[in-house]
C-alpha cells in the first residue's frame, strides 16, 4: 500500500477560542486535496473497553465493523465549524482519510471540518442552523452546506 504525501501550503497555529488549528499560507482552490492522513485503528473491543473513556474518543472517526480510526498528521488538527470549508473521505480498505477543500480558501483562513451534531463542547454557533451529516458516512451531504 502506498499513501501519497501532500505538500500543501498549510501551517498549524494557536487560535483564541479553539486551541490549535490548520491555516492556509496562500490561496487554495476549491476541491484541492490538502491532506491524506494515515489512520491508527482501534478494534471494536479495544475502543469499548478503553478508547471511549479517554481523550482519544474526541479525535476518532467511526470506521467499518465497529472500529474507530484515529487520524494522524493534520487529520487530527482540523477544528469544527458548522459551515466547514473542508470535507473528508475515508478509505476503509487502506485505512486513511483524505481531506479536500469545499471552496476556494483565502490566505490565513482556518480550515475546518464538521464534527456533526454530537459535540462534546459548547459550539459558539449552536443557535445557527445545523448540518446533519450521517456520521457513519464520510461523504456527508455536500448539498446541505451553504457556500
Curated annotation (Swiss-Prot):
It catalyses: L-lysyl(37)-[histone H3] + S-adenosyl-L-methionine = N(6)-methyl-L-lysyl(37)-[histone H3] + S-adenosyl-L-homocysteine + H(+); N(6)-methyl-L-lysyl(37)-[histone H3] + S-adenosyl-L-methionine = N(6),N(6)-dimethyl-L-lysyl(37)-[histone H3] + S-adenosyl-L-homocysteine + H(+); N(6),N(6)-dimethyl-L-lysyl(37)-[histone H3] + S-adenosyl-L-methionine = N(6),N(6),N(6)-trimethyl-L-lysyl(37)-[histone H3] + S-adenosyl-L-homocysteine + H(+). Disruption phenotype: Abnormal sporulation resulting in asci with fewer than four spores and with abnormal spore wall morphology. Its main location: cytoplasm. GO terms for molecular function: histone H3K37 methyltransferase activity. It is found in: Cytoplasm; Nucleus. Pfam families: SET. Its EC number is 2.1.1.-. GO terms for biological process: chromatin organization; methylation; sporulation resulting in formation of a cellular spore. Residues 8-116 form the SET domain. It comes from the Eukaryota. Transmembrane segments: none annotated. Changing residue 115 to A: Abolishes activity. One of its GO terms (cellular component) is cytosol. Keywords: Cytoplasm, Methyltransferase, Nucleus, S-adenosyl-L-methionine, Sporulation, Transferase. PROSITE patterns: SET. Gene3D superfamilies: SET domain. Belongs to the class V-like SAM-binding methyltransferase superfamily. Histone lysine methyltransferase that specifically mono-, di-, and trimethylates 'Lys-37' of histone H3 to regulate sporulation. Homodimer. This is Histone-lysine N-methyltransferase, H3 lysine-37 specific. It comes from Schizosaccharomyces pombe (strain 972 / ATCC 24843) (Fission yeast).
Amino acid at each position: 500500500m502506498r499513501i501519497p504525501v501532500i505538500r500543501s501550503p498549510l501551517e498549524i497555529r494557536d487560535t483564541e477560542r479553539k486551541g490549535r488549528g490548520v491555516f492556509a499560507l496562500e490561496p487554495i482552490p476549491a476541491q484541492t486535496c490538502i491532506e491524506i492522513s494515515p489512520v491508527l485503528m482501534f478494534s471494536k473491543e479495544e475502543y469499548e473497553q478503553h478508547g471511549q473513556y479517554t481523550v482519544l474518543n474526541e479525535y476518532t472517526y467511526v470506521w467499518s465493523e465497529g472500529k474507530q480510526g484515529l487520524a494522524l498528521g493534520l487529520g487530527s488538527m482540523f477544528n469544527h465549524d458548522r459551515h466547514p470549508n473542508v470535507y473528508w473521505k475515508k478509505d476503509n480498505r487502506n485505512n486513511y482519510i483524505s481531506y479536500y477543500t469545499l471552496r476556494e480558501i483565502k490566505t490565513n483562513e482556518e480550515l475546518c471540518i464538521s464534527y456533526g451534531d454530537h459535540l462534546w463542547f459548547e459550539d459558539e454557533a449552536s443557535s445557527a442552523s445545523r448540518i446533519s451529516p450521517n456520521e457513519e458516512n464520510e461523504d456527508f451531504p455536500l448539498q446541505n452546506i451553504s457556500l
